[in-house]
A protein has these predicted regions:
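Hydrophobic core of transmembrane alpha-helices in multi-pass small-molecule transporters
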Residues: 62, 66, 136-140, 149-167, ...
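Helix-to-loop junctions at the C-terminal end of transmembrane segments
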Residues: 109-123, 332-348, 367, 443
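Cytosolic juxtamembrane N-terminal segment immediately preceding the first transmembrane helix
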Residues: 2-70, 255, 267-275
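C-terminal transmembrane helical hairpin of 12-TM major facilitator-type secondary transporters
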Residues: 326, 346-400
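Extracytoplasmic gate region of multi-pass secondary transporters
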Residues: 67, 71-80, 279-338, 345, ...
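Conserved MFS/SLC helix-loop-helix module at the cytosolic interface between two early adjacent transmembrane helices
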Residues: 108-150
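Helix-loop-helix hairpin linking two adjacent transmembrane segments in secondary transporters
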Residues: 197, 204-254
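Intracellular juxtamembrane helix-capping segments at the cytosolic ends
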Residues: 82, 164-187, 200, 392-411
Length: 490
């Protein structure tokens, strides 16, 4: 007597080595014994399951932006609190390097972690990310027991940033693989509907800017109600909880964990082509990124303090500046990416970076430098303008990578776009660290200046000039391109 087993959809399906959803159909054999009668892939079930999985992965990546960037994007609020409520040994001026050091360490770690977790240690991504979450949380807890300024620098600027980098790199690599442009909705490769990796990155970048919009107010509330020690412990718990949740939601893609072509093919795929380092183009853009990043982190760190000390604004207004600084980045990243990658009027990478750099410099020199006591409107205008144009600078890297890929094709050379992107992030990290180290002597240089009518005449005058000049040099690639073209003509 035959019979059909009643099995749930979850039990009917599993995932094969390629990420394909496979449905098993069970039936009777006429003798009452159950066996597998057919084995088939079901496109509808496969696509539904894959879409659900990608939605959860995108949710996890979006959540991860809070623990990764929340502290660094709101550090200006902590910086202001440290200066106004200083009780630790050492100079409070040193706290100015924490925010830029945190960003620098995070970005500098990306090239190395990307190289390690791309293939060789891909199976250990979630473990590494969990270890990073634990390290970041522990660092913030240890920081709450600080008694000297260097304790803050070591825990918040270095250790916590390393932990955040360990969360960022593995999860971002997996996100890109699940939304690979050449992968079908079913999870395998083929000619089906392509997934939107760029859209996925755009959503997570938008969430990063959303974090930067509300975190300053959250940090302010925690500091005012509990003080920095309890606030750091609360943040450690929030960072750990959201990190673990995001890590659970972002598994490594199955195709990365298998080697269908054998050991030789796996070894070949691990080799990273470095031919692009022989050409001048990469170094031109890398230097430009370093210079632009050196000044980019300074407003994020010092704007709240500047608003309180120089323009005499309230704490709420000072915090609002950071929110206004981060919000425009949601739109700017998409716009600058579109300028260098559209079918109607595509602009070269040098042109787009020059637009971002020049407008950022003008905003700094003409708006920030000319603010005076009580000029909230002008500071808000600077925050929005600088945040838009400088915040969109990293979105120009897609055009930079396209140019390097075209150059590699011209020379018939292989190129790894992911590795180039990691190195560009590393250049950004060098800029962040350099800017943080330079900011302290610049503040000391302006320390003897009396508070004047405009920002240039204040203690922050040298910092304002440095930010403006570094922004200008962030677009020097267009000068190099014009010079090279002129040489060829002559």
């Amino acid at each position: 007597m035959s019979r059909i087993e009643s099995i749930s959809l979850h039990e009917l399906s599993s995932t094969d080595a390629r990420g394909e959803q496979v449905a098993y159909v069970f039936g009777g054999d006429g003798d009452g014994d159950n066996d597998v009668r057919t084995l088939a892939t079901t496109p509808d079930v496969r696509q539904t399951e894959a879409s659900r999985k990608r939605a959860l992965i995108l949710l996890g990546a979006s959540i991860s932006q809070l623990p990764i960037w929340g502290f660094s994007m709101s550090y200006g609020v902590f910086q202001e609190y440290y200066i106004n409520h200083w009780t630790l040994a050492g100079s409070s001026d040193v706290t100015g390097i924490i925010g830029t050091t945190s960003n620098g360490v995070l970005y500098l770690s990306i090239p190395f972690l990307s190289a390690v977790f791309t293939r060789r240690w891909a199976a250990h991504r979630q473990t590494a990310a969990a270890a990073g979450a634990a390290l970041a949380a522990l660092s913030f807890v240890l920081s709450s027991f600080s008694s000297h300024v260097w304790h803050l620098v070591a825990t918040q600027g270095v250790l916590a940033a390393l932990g955040c980098a360990l969360v960022y790199s593995p999860t971002t690599l997996s996100l890109g693989e699940w939304f690979s442009a050449g992968v079908t909705n079913g999870g395998g490769s083929g000619n089906g509907m392509k997934n939107h990796r760029a859209v996925a990155y755009g959503v997570t970048l938008s969430c990063k800017n959303v974090v930067g919009s509300f975190m300053p107010f959250l940090a302010r509330a925690l500091l005012e109600h509990y003080g920095f020690r309890v606030a750091l412990r609360i943040w450690a718990a929030v960072a750990l909880g959201t990190s673990v949740l995001s890590i659970i939601l972002i598994p490594t893609h199955p195709t990365i964990l298998t080697s269908p072509s054998g050991e030789e093919e796996a070894h070949r795929r691990r080799n990273i082509p470095w031919h692009f380092l022989r050409h001048r183009t990469f170094y031109v853009y890398a230097v430009a990124i370093i210079l632009q990043s050196a000044g980019y982190g300074i407003p994020q760190t010092y704007l709240p303090t500047y608003a309180r000390e120089i323009t005499r604004l309230s704490q709420t207004s000072a915090t609002l500046l950071l929110t206004v600084f981060n919000v425009p980045g949601i739109l700017a990243s998409s716009l600058f990416g579109y300028l260098s990658d559209n079918r109607y009027f595509p602009l070269s990478a040098t042109t787009v970076t020059a637009i971002s750099a020049l407008c950022s410099a003008l905003a700094t020199l003409l708006l920030w430098g000319l603010t005076s006591q009580g000029s909230l409107a002008l500071l808000l205008l600077f925050s929005a303008t600088f945040g838009f144009f400088a915040g969109g600078y990293s979105a120009t890297w897609g055009g930079v990578i396209n140019e390097l890929e075209s150059e590699a094709a011209h020379w018939n050379e292989a190129v790894d776009a992911g590795m180039i992107y990691g190195l560009l992030n590393g250049a950004r990290g060098i800029g962040y660290v350099s800017g943080g180290l330079v900011s302290i002597p610049l503040l000391e240089a302006g320390g003897g200046v009396s508070i004047g009518e405009f920002g240039y005449a204040s203690t922050y005058g040298p910092l304002i000039l440095f930010t403006g000049l570094s922004s200008i040099f962030g677009g020097w690639g267009i000068v190099w391109k014009w010079t090279s073209s002129l040489r060829r003509l002559l």
